A protein has these predicted regions:
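Domain-level signal for soluble alpha/beta catalytic cores
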Residues: 1-768, 776-778
């Protein structure tokens, strides 16, 4: 019989119950016992839900109060110094201190989980690291499930992935700690076997990455050691991409089963079917666990049948999602306001598990057993392919006839710079902000009121005009050189634009976990994208009418809108991105026509889009750069195009950033004390040719830096860049800060820039050395 299996279920609950419980606990409104009771209740609800959906292998251990990588670190005793832990069970207060920081101790670093929009906490290890089993969490959760009537399949993050996803304090190779870590995993597996656990799922997602030979040897050593002792059957699971050149390693490991991501790694299947077949189970990830589209059940069933024929029947086949369903919302049934044409095309976690169960049944009993499911899948595919809304002929024609010249500015940057300087008349070290100002309780109340119908649209718009007017007056008084309107009308940097573009849709309850209690409801790009009317022009033009100083137009870039959405899967991502770029191009040129001389197109997710394998980077970077240029290249030479990127490793994509051909880029540099600028500096081998705004204020902290600190950071920037390149700005937008933090911090920032101008003028006049670094001055 084919096994219907799941790799992981969303943790947050249908109505974000986990978020509510966590935030009440952190606020002191819910004690530890009550929080743990709510976690146990949610887990039981999720287990019973999956059981009711006819899933044979229901996972346990996929639930977490914050992050599964942190759970693993705590289980194996990988607690760095400074958190008050001296061995034994890790308390909940220590767990949350690692996640969120406490009493002056910083939280662990957080970064993206592979190429998803989930974030994990990075374990910190050292060469002196000693591991210990603080508590057998998989065993405890298995027993918890048994208490409510289920035998589950415990899920563990594999030892090699755990180490490779960690960082060492001294820069040593985490894999050197494998011999010390393996006894902990062997003990966990032994105790699970003694409990009567039949299967355990060992996740090794690093198999989808470019691995060194040392890492491949580590996998062989690890699973050889785990097989040499009592243990349940191990299902080795990798996901997020093809195994490719790591497939041979995976096939040689002494495990009972292998899971394949056939949504993103379908090319692995032929190799697996051609390889020698020991008595191994094969788990087929036929239902995409990372997107929200209904599966093509007929095509998936055809693939499953091919495998069954090659595998000698269905006795050793599992059907599963491609990866954990952590990355999709819980249940589509609660979405009562979605477009009637869109909803039948979708599948959230619950619906995806129904698809898994249907495929398993169809493989065992034949097509007739799942006739209704197959017909519904076929209807959805036909409707999508023939819909005039999904496939807009006007958009297709525009994309098809866009000439290469669409991506090119009229002149080189050097010529544009002179014309922009003449138009803007800015001082040296011009000051600006990244775009948004604090979203106060008053703003949120007004937005909620207009949503409920308690405030008219006209009243709401008058309120926005009032906030913009106050912001413009205040920026003028402060002495900022290039102003912003404050983005008071915007709820979210992607949602705001998506709500006004054709082709986007939004859910009421389509929440997914970003990290901890932070949840996001990504837009759905379900149809061809176009702009029916201007989006931001009214507010930017209104702000500009209040001042003689330049006001920046503020847009979210095409790559970021793509990356932070659920993207249609019936056409290439590149094509979707180009559609967004053309829609934004219209907005950019309309802003210019309205008198806006500086237009910022933010791309904080530009680097996030990089594929997991380096061999695939160039193709992505080519179309990502092209789409940015399509969006921005339609303006005159004297209109400045700016962009903004968040904290990232820029060295390996500097050529692509330069190729975007923006007139200025602002980046997050405060925490690195300008070290990130090394990638942009003349000695880097790929010097950035245009202007740069290195952030001088860490806006992620409530702390207000003084003028001296900012001046010192600017001095460090001058040691790496020419003076003419440098803009002065915060690290990022100020939406999440409070006005009582913003006003003094920006006043200090303006003072730091003025101080720098005075010193530069003295040097230019008298040839005297300044007291800040000027190695890069020009």
């Amino acid at each position: 019989m084919t096994i219907a299996a799941n790799l992981g279920f969303p943790r947050i609950g249908r109505r974000r119950e986990l978020k509510t419980a966590l935030e009440r606990h952190w606020a002191g409104e819910l004690d530890e016992a009550a929080l743990l009771a709510e976690a146990a209740r949610l887990s039981a609800v999720h287990w019973r839900c999956q059981q009711g959906l006819r899933i044979n292998h229901v996972p346990s251990g996929d639930f977490s109060l914050y992050d599964h990588v942190l759970d693993t670190a705590c289980m194996v005793g990988a607690i760095p110094p400074g958190y008050g832990w001296s061995g034994g069970p890790v308390t909940l207060s220590t767990f949350f201190a690692l996640a969120r920081g406490a009493h002056g101790t910083a939280a662990l670093e957080m970064t993206k989980w592979f190429d998803t929009n989930y974030h994990y906490l990075v374990p910190r290890l050292s060469t002196a690291q000693q591991f210990q089993l603080t508590a057998n969490r998989p065993l405890a959760l298995y027993r918890e499930a048994r208490a409510v009537g289920l035998r589950t399949r415990p899920v563990l993050l594999g030892p090699v992935s755990f180490l490779l996803l960690s960082k060492t304090l001294d820069g040593s190779d985490p894999l050197d700690l494998l011999d010390r870590l393996l006894p902990i995993y062997r003990q966990v597996l032994r105790e699970l076997a003694e409990e009567g656990v039949a299967w355990v799922q060992m996740d090794e997602p690093v198999l989808a990455l470019d691995l060194s030979e040392k890492a491949r040897i580590a996998l062989a050593l690890a699973y050889g050691a785990l097989a040499d002792g009592p243990a349940p059957d191990i299902l080795l699971a990798s996901y997020f991409g093809k195994l490719g050149d790591n497939l041979g390693t995976a096939l040689r490991l002494p495990v009972a089963g292998l899971h394949l991501d056939l949504a993103r790694g379908a090319s692995d299947l032929d190799t697996v079917l051609e390889a020698p077949r020991p008595e191994r189970w094969l788990s087929l990830g036929l239902v995409d666990g990372r997107n929200i589209w209904r599966a093509d059940l007929r095509a998936a069933l055809t693939t499953a049948r091919r495998v069954a024929q090659a595998w000698g029947g269905t006795a050793r086949i599992m059907i599963a999602p491609s990866c954990s369903l952590l990355h999709v919302p819980v249940d589509l049934d609660g979405e009562d306001r979605l477009d009637a044409e869109l909803k039948p095309l979708l599948a959230f976690a619950v619906q995806k598990l129904r698809e898994v169960a249907a495929l398993a049944r169809g493989l065992d009993e034949g097509e007739a057993a799942i006739k209704d499911e197959l017909e519904a899948s076929d209807r959805a595919a036909r409707a999508r392919a023939t819909s005039a809304r999904v496939n807009d002929p006007a958009v297709a024609a525009r994309v098809g006839k866009a000439a290469p010249e669409t991506e090119e500015r009229t002149s080189t940057y050097a010529k544009r710079r002179e014309r922009q300087r003449a138009r803007l008349s800015l001082p040296a070290f011009p000051t600006t902000t990244i775009g948004s100002f604090p979203q106060t309780a008053e703003i949120r109340r007004a937005r909620a009121a207009v949503g409920r119908g308690d405030m008219t649209a006209a009243e709401y718009e008058r309120s926005i005009e009032g906030w913009i007017g106050e912001a413009v007056r205040w920026q003028e008084e402060l002495g900022l050189d290039v102003l912003v309107h404050g983005e008071f009308e915007r709820n979210d940097m992607v949602k705001y634009f998506g709500e006004q573009l054709r082709g986007f849709a939004f859910t009421r309850h389509g929440w997914v976990q970003s990290y901890g209690s932070r949840c996001v409801a990504p837009p759905i790009i379900w149809a061809d994208v176009s702009r029916p009317e201007p989006i931001t022009v009214r507010w930017a033009a209104y702000a500009q009418s209040l001042t003689d100083r330049p006001v920046k137009g503020m847009l979210t870039g095409p790559v970021t809108m793509l990356q932070w959405s659920f993207v249609r899967d019936d056409i290439p991502r590149e094509q979707v991105c180009r559609q967004i770029a053309l829609a934004l191009r219209d907005e950019v040129t309309d802003l210019e026509a309205a008198g806006i001389a500086v237009i910022q197109v933010d791309e904080p997710a530009f680097r996030e889009g990089l594929p997991l394998r380096r061999a695939d980077w160039d193709a992505y970077l080519r179309w990502a750069v092209a789409c940015f240029r399509v969006a921005t290249a339609g303006v005159r030479d004297d209109t400045a195009i700016h962009t903004h990127m968040c904290y990232a490793e820029f060295n390996d994509i500097m050529a692509a950033i330069a190729a975007m051909d923006a007139d200025a880029i602002s980046i997050e540099t405060t925490r690195s004390r300008m070290e990130l600028l090394d990638a942009f500096a003349p000695g880097s081998g790929a010097a950035y040719p245009a202007e740069i705004g290195p952030g001088v204020w860490d806006i992620h902290s409530p702390r207000v830096p003084d003028t001296d600190e900012m001046a010192e950071l600017l001095g460090l920037a001058r040691g790496r860049l020419a003076d003419w390149q440098i803009w002065v700005n915060p690290d990022c937008g100020l939406k999440t800060r409070k006005w009582e933090e913003v006003r003094p911090a920006l006043a200090n920032m303006v003072d730091a820039a003025r101080r720098l101008r005075v010193r530069q003028a003295a040097v230019d006049r008298d040839g005297l050395p300044g007291d800040v670094g000027t190695a890069g001055s020009a």
